């Protein structure tokens, strides 16, 4: 294995909402795991591919205007190499698909905790995901939350790129099929007399 790399939880305050929720003891936070100078996070979108995305560590502006960097929490260290971490994130992407996002059961903080457990054997602090706990007690709470909370700006551009790539692949495949059928049609064929 490689060098001992710090595993850091970057926590973001959804500050305009926290003006209201902090008075009742519930913060609304987004989180991501930083390792090897890269930050991995998870968000929802309506498609059946990975909702995991990458941003510059601690850069709240990449998440959107409703986010503000709150703090970095050192969770531990890992001996995984950077290539190993990419494979781990890719595997987690099969479970953390965009259309599987759920505020109570599978949100960004659940992802951060899962990745942290794999990398350094520790869950994230409980206070970061307190909203999920309370919303499981008050089911209608999720329907009251703005849709943009589910899909941070950084993920929206990642999803747009993924969809653009899929469209280009489909167009390339269609063009190849068209060229192949045209070429096949211009080949001399067998002619038989009846």
Swiss-Prot record:
GO biological process terms, alphabetically, are: proteolysis
Q: Which residues form the active site?
A: 30, 108
Q: How does it assemble?
A: Interacts with RPS7.
**PANTHER family registered for this protein in UniProt:** DESUMOYLATING ISOPEPTIDASE, DEUBIQUITINASE DESI2
Q: Which UniProt keywords apply?
A: Cytoplasm, Hydrolase, Protease, Ubl conjugation pathway
User: What is the first-listed, main subcellular location in coarse terms?
Assistant: cytoplasm
Q: Which InterPro entries match?
A: PPPDE_dom, PPPDE_sf
Q: Where in the cell is it found?
A: Cytoplasm
The record's Gene3D superfamilies line, in alphabetical order, gives: PPPDE domains
Q: What is its EC number?
A: 3.4.19.12, 3.1.2.22
- Name of the protein in question: Deubiquitinase DESI2
Organism domain of life: Eukaryota
Composition-biased stretches, type Low complexity, lie in: 173-186
Gene that specifies this protein:
DESI2
Q: Which family does it belong to?
A: Belongs to the DeSI family.
Q: Which organism is it from?
A: Homo sapiens (Human)
Q: What is the lineage of its organism?
A: Eukaryota, Metazoa, Chordata, Craniata, Vertebrata
Function according to Swiss-Prot or TrEMBL: Has deubiquitinating activity towards 'Lys-48'- and 'Lys-63'-linked polyubiquitin chains. Deubiquitinates 'Lys-48'-linked polyubiquitination of RPS7 leading to its stabilization. Exhibits palmitoyl protein thioesterase (S-depalmitoylation) activity towards synthetic substrates 4-methylumbelliferyl-6-S-palmitoyl-beta-D-glucopyranoside and S-depalmitoylation probe 5 (DPP-5).
A Pfam family (short name) is Peptidase_C97
Q: Does the keyword Transport apply?
A: no
């Amino acid at each position: 294995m490689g060098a001992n790399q710090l595993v850091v939880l970057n926590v973001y305050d959804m500050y305009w909402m926290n003006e209201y929720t902090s008075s009742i003891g519930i913060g609304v936070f987004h989180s991501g795991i930083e390792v090897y100078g890269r930050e991995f996070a998870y968000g929802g979108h309506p498609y059946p591919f990975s909702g995991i995305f990458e941003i510059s560590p601690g850069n709240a502006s990449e998440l959107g205007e409703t986010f503000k960097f709150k703090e970095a929490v050192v969770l531990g260290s890992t001996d995984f190499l950077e290539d190993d971490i990419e494979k781990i994130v890719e595997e987690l992407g099969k479970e953390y698909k965009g259309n599987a996002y759920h505020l109570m059961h599978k949100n960004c903080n659940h992802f951060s905790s899962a990745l942290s457990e794999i990398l350094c054997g520790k869950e994230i602090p409980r206070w970061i995901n307190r909203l999920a706990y309370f919303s499981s007690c008050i089911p209608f709470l999720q329907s009251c939350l703005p849709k943009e909370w589910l899909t941070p700006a950084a993920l929206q551009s990642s999803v747009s790129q993924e969809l653009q790539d899929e469209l280009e692949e489909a167009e390339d495949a269609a063009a190849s099929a068209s060229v192949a059928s045209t070429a096949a049609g211009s080949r001399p064929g067998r002619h038989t007399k009846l």
